[in-house]
Amino acid sequence: MLSYKDIINKIDQLEEANIILSALEFNVFSVLEKNSLQAKQVASLTKTKLEGMEILLNALVAMGILNKNKNIFTNTPVTYKYFCQTSPDFRIGTVMLMMDSRGEFEKLS
């Protein structure tokens, strides 16, 4: 049986997964490629609002998924290698299958 703490940990994991999936949906890793960009540049290239993109990028930094230095964001070697469309090792297929099943329990009500 899961403890209260275990259940809260699972909820936290879901929140982190949703942050990563949102970054993939907006092609954040491909927009960054090997570049160093400010949040306003990423927002412009992804056609998103600056405030929301700043929150997303900073959440990714807090999770260790992106790097940030003086308000400049960059991919980590892992995010470039596997989640950037220009990388020869791009592996988005599995993640996209997971994204397709995100809403499968929304139809319960």
Question: Model regions: which residues?
Answer:
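N-terminal accessory segments
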Residues: 1-109
